[in-house]
Amino acid sequence: MTHPNLLVGTKTSDDAAVYKLSDDLAVVLTIDFFPPIVDDPFTFGQIAAANSLSDVYAMGAKPIAALNIVGFPSDLDMSILGEILKGGASKALEAGIIIAGGHSVVDAEPKYGLSVTGIVNPGSQTVNSNSKPGDLLVLTKPIGTGVITTAGKQEKVDVDVLKNAVEIMATLNKTASEAMISVGVNACSDVTGFGLLGHLREMMEGSGTGARIYKSKVPVIEGTEDLLNQGIAPGGTMRNLESLNPTVLWGKEILENDKILLCDAQTSGGLLISVDPNKADELQKSLSEAGTLSNQIVGEVYSPSENDPTIHVIG
């Protein structure tokens, strides 16, 4: 669907839609929800809300309001739903937005998320399809949440490893987005279900560019690689790897577990930012001052020739 005021739609697989209301105001619209990935209902609510808000932050926009989206079994204690909603409300408060209402349906398993509305100056949104050759790629959170939460469901993960992953997932991308806006960058996406390489592929295909990723520079949540060595890999992660293989050139030094890790399906992951190399130091400094979990440069963008892969991963 197209419309003169629809500035960002589905064409480039962007994180949210952007609709122009006036010369100096556009709304940013997104929705996301999913079943629990942790046992504690309050924590699940926090993670789901942070994940939903992330799409607006990735667009370089300011969230202002949200609606709850709920699926809940009729035979479960309603106090569980109350805790989920409290968790979501706590993140909304932290983000400085209101939850103005919502909608619920009876479902076989709990599901929760937010429909988020944000605002941005038309033309100032940060899309995922404007990477430039020579740009550096910066990641604001470590990866590994898919592997760790899967291990948690199997009761095969150290409690401290899981706790750390939960804290990372519940962390808003608010300050990372504000730092990105203050510097001015070329493109951005948040890293979620398609994994680091999946979202990078969307950025590169939308921009008509290619990317070189340095595996050794990608920040990883402590304990993730030990779990991979135990053979723990989420189904979604393995589907990501299967989908990505035709468009990725893997360096000879890249092991199978490295491939799985770089394709690991994330929940409430960090921002993957494509920035002009002349602004990279300033961006890293701003991210550090904002207290983000990572400000690591993980790769670079290049202009591919006809036979080049979309993504080249080296050690």
Please tell me what each predicted stretch does:
Residues A17-V28, A170-A176, L241-K252:
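Acidic-glycine-rich active-site phosphate/pyrophosphate-binding loop
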Residues L21-V38, T43, K62-D158, G299-Y302:
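Glycine-rich anion-binding loops of enzyme active sites
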Residues P41-L67, E83-E94, L172-G184, V191-E202, ...:
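Small-aliphatic-rich amphipathic alpha-helix that forms the alpha element of a beta-alpha
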Residues L137, I143-G144, C188-G193, M203:
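A structural signal for small-residue-enriched, beta-sheet-centric alpha/beta enzyme cores
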